[in-house]
Amino acid sequence: VAKFNVGGPDFTDEELAGWLGNYRGDLTIINTASASGSYIREMAKPGRVVITATKNEGEISFTRFGRFFAEAVGGLIDADLDNDQQVSLLESFLFASNRVALFYKDDTRLATEHALIDDNGDTLGSRAEWFEGTTPTQTPSAEAKPDGDLAAQKVLVKNAFEKRLTPEQTKQRDELERQVVALRRSKSSLDEADYYAKLESLLLELARIYDAVGDS
């Protein structure tokens, strides 16, 4: 059990999970403290992004993940992996994880923190090494779905174009992008003509949204 230090009685990850148990909206939980890994197990649910600095509550040493994550999420250009002039939560996680790994490597020390991200609700979490760019290439198990899709669409400091999207346009765009990702992952099981026809349809719908924003 991991505890969160606050003024007054500390509370546990299990207690926080209980308080948020009936919350039905989108939720992002970022715990950059040591021993934070259990928050993946306790807090992960569909529609949530959970990021922790450690892989379990046994990693109790001082963590450096939070410093690098804070730098990235504010819009650090080096963290913008897809070059869209903004930095998503996924990109921030990947950047911070890689910087942590470099810190320990350059200091010739054994790494005592291994960050995790979970945004598919399976409570398993994924490591930064399991991504190539922003594309997941590995999952915790053969049956598990990849993490990262939801976190890739969440941005704290938006670019100029993103600011012009209405909430409804953002919702439509995000859903279409998720459909494109799902389609690409199923490419091997589809007829080639069928695959490209479906992809073209989705991309045209995305283009209509972008055109509408450009004309506004």
Task: Enumerate the predicted regions with their spans.
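A short, glycine/acidic-enriched catalytic loop
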Residues: V1-N22
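Disordered regulatory segments flanking catalytic cores
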Residues: R109-S216
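Extracytoplasmic/secreted envelope proteins and their assembly/folding machinery
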Residues: D13-L20, S36, R48, F62-A70, ...
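A short linear-motif detector with a strong N-terminal bias
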Residues: G8-P9, T28-T32, F161-E162
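Active-site-proximal C-terminal subdomain of hydrolase catalytic domains
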Residues: L27-R127
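Second-shell loop/turn segments in exported
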Residues: A2-G7, A53-E59, A79-N83, E162-T170, ...
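Structured segments of extracytoplasmic/periplasmic soluble domains
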Residues: W19-D26, E42, E71-A79, F95-D106, ...
